[in-house]
């Protein structure tokens, strides 16, 4: 029997991936909420979705369904709202007897994780989060190869992620550190989670560059030394970007070899949903290390590098090719 899903933040950028995953796992969307009412996308999935611009009426609707016949109640709430609302919307879902599938970051501040675990125990419902890079076939294969190597070996890793964003980004909630968690959280958390999953926990962390649109630093992990760089500045792309064309560059070099994972992103959310429905979702314990790390990065001052710096910083931030070298 199909399960019933509800979605918060349904008008946002990420929600179509969740709507597709709900459909492709054989389940049905019954309710959605967003303060913005440009939600015609719902008709691509169902004409029977109850939509509420007010979160209070959405909450009331879920409560009424919970008190009705079992086949009508909401079994899962998918949370696609802005980062600073995730914690509150997780609590709303649990209060209404639903499991949770929450976009990353699960929360902005790590001290909110323990209360959510208490709510899991109280309600008997699980909180899962979307760590989609952990289900990417190429990255699963890489982890298998790394796990077969001597654990004492330290890999050299260079992470570069630049994604062009216009002026809108800075005035939206995404450009507000209080509401998004800042650059390291909003665009970096899935990459930091990947690094921790592949190479183990943090022994040392330094921030070498801290600007509203750029950050860079160094991580010493259990099995890797990582030089990282994040940016929403179009000038940091190693190619000329035009509106409507490719605007993102991601590169991970492991021991000098490029990790190729640019393909295979189309169904990762569906794979995450399949894991959740099989009882194998990524929970609070999985999400905690990266949330703690980005909180530490967000609150750390930029310091003069005591060790290795990202190639972009070594070469300067202009006239770069894909390896951070001057052309």
List each model region and its residues:
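Rossmann-like dinucleotide-binding domain that binds NAD(P)(H)
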Residues: 167-237, 288-292
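N-terminal Rossmann-like dinucleotide-binding module
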Residues: 1-48
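Beta-loop-alpha module in the N-terminal Rossmann-like domain of NAD(P)-dependent dehydrogenases
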Residues: 51-101, 105-118
């Amino acid at each position: 029997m199909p399960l019933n899903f509800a979605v918060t933040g349904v008008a946002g950028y990420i929600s179509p991936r969740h709507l597709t995953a709900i459909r492709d796992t054989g389940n049905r969307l019954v309710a959605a909420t967003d303060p913005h009412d440009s939600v015609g996308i719902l008709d691509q999935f169902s004409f029977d979705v109850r939509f509420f611009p007010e979160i209070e009426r959405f909450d009331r609707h879920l409560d009424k369904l919970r008190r009705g016949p079992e086949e009508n109640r909401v079994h899962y709430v998918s949370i696609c709202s802005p980062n600073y609302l995730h914690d509150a919307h997780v609590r709303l879902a649990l209060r209404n007897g639903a499991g949770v599938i929450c976009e990353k970051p699960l929360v902005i501040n790590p001290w909110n994780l323990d209360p959510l675990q208490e709510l899991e125990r109280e309600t008997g419902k699980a909180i899962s989060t979307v760590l989609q890079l952990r289900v990417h076939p190429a990255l699963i294969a890489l982890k298998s190869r790394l796990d077969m190597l001597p654990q004492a070996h330290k890999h050299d890793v260079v992470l570069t992620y630049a994604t062009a964003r216009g002026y809108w980004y800075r005035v939206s909630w995404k450009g507000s550190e209080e509401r998004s968690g800042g650059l390291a959280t909003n665009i970096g958390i899935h990459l930091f989670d990947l690094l921790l999953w592949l190479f183990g926990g943090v022994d040392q962390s330094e921030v070498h560059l801290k600007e509203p649109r750029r950050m860079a630093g160094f991580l010493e992990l259990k099995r890797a030394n990582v030089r990282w760089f994040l940016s929403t500045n179009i000038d940091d792309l190693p190619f000329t970007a035009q509106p409507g064309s490719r605007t993102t560059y991601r590169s991970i070099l492991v021991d000098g070899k490029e990790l190729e994972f640019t393909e295979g992103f189309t169904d990762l959310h569906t794979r995450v949903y399949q894991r959740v429905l099989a009882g194998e979702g990524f929970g609070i314990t999985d999400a905690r290390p990266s949330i703690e790390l980005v909180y530490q990065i967000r609150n750390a001052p930029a310091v003069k590098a005591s060790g290795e710096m990202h190639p972009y910083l070594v070469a300067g931030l202009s006239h770069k090719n894909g390896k951070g070298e001057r052309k």
